[in-house]
Structure formats: structure tokens, C-alpha cells
């Protein structure tokens, strides 16, 4: 599976590293040079060609994150949006792409993992999600 990670900052570098460590074919796009095990592209996430990606993980700053999704929403892509945006998901009606909108690490991704565990293992009596700190430490 070919995954394009857009943005290699605090969250982006963490997510990219975890995906590489899990054995995925990961390409990291950023406008700042980054040290990474992924195949690195010094390029704008907005202007790069992502047509060969199976999944796009949008982790650019929220101030431009909505622009990335808006440009890709009609290209038949599968997009996971981890950038915080003040835009609402109603703009994703009648589009050609699948968008998991404003997922975030926690509570977004963590809640999806709890739901997956519940489906796999049955009723969960208790779930604790601890949030905070630097994910790279």
C-alpha cells in the first residue's frame, strides 16, 4: 500500500515514522527538509501529484489543511484528514473521494481504534485514553 503523508511536522513526523515502521510504502511531502525513513519529497503538498497514492494522510497546518482536501476531494482519492480545520464536513457532499474528516490523533484516531477493538473483542468494560505531550518522545 502506497501512502502519501502530507506535512512532516510534530504530528506528521510521528505518523510517518509509525507507518514506515509498520512496513508501508510511505512518501512524505513537506516544504521543509526532513530527516525520515520514508521516501522524502521536498515539495508543496498542494502542488504535488498524489494520483498514485492508495491513501493520503493530510497533516499540514490547519490554516491550509482545508485547501489540500478541497483540491483532492474530486480526484477519487482516499483521504484521512488529521489537520484541524474550522471548515465543516458538509462541503464533502457529492464528491468523488472518501474523506475521513478532521480525524486528529486523539480523540479522533484513538476513538476509531476503541471502536475497532470493541467490534473485534466485544463489549469493553473500560477504556482509558491518555492525551498530551510530544508524540515524538
What are the language-model segments listed below?
Residues 116-137:
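Conserved anion/nucleotide-ligand pocket segment
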Residues 82-101:
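Rossmann-fold NAD(P)-binding glycine/threonine-rich loop
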Residues 3-7:
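Conserved N-terminal Rossmann-fold NAD(P)-binding element of oxidoreductases
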Residues 24-37:
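NAD(P)-binding Rossmann-fold cofactor-contacting core
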Residues 55-71, 87:
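Beta-loop-alpha module in the N-terminal Rossmann-like domain of NAD(P)-dependent dehydrogenases
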Residues 74-77, 97:
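A short helix->loop->beta-strand "cap" motif at the edges of active sites that frequently abuts
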Residues 19:
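Aromatic pocket-lining residues of Rossmann-like dinucleotide-binding sites
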Residues 11:
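Hydrophobic/small residue at the entry helix of a nucleotide-binding pocket
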Amino acid at each position: 500500500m502506497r501512502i502519501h503523508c502530507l506535512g512532516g511536522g510534530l504530528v506528521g513526523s510521528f505518523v510517518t515514522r509509525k507507518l514506515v515502521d509498520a512496513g508501508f510504502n510511505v512518501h512524505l511531502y513537506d516544504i521543509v527538509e526532513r530527516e525520515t525513513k520514508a521516501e522524502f519529497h521536498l515539495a508543496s503538498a498542494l502542488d504535488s501529484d498524489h494520483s498514485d497514492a492508495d491513501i493520503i494522510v493530510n497533516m499540514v497546518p490547519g490554516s491550509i489543511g482545508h485547501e489540500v482536501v478541497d483540491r483532492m476531494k474530486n480526484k477519487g482519492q482516499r483521504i484521512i484528514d488529521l489537520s484541524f480545520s474550522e471548515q465543516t464536513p458538509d462541503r464533502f457532499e457529492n464528491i468523488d473521494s472518501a474523506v475521513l474528516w478532521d480525524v486528529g490523533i486523539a480523540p479522533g484516531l484513538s476513538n476509531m481504534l476503541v471502536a475497532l477493538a470493541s467490534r473485534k473483542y466485544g463489549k469493553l468494560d473500560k477504556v482509558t485514553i491518555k492525551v498530551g505531550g510530544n508524540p515524538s518522545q
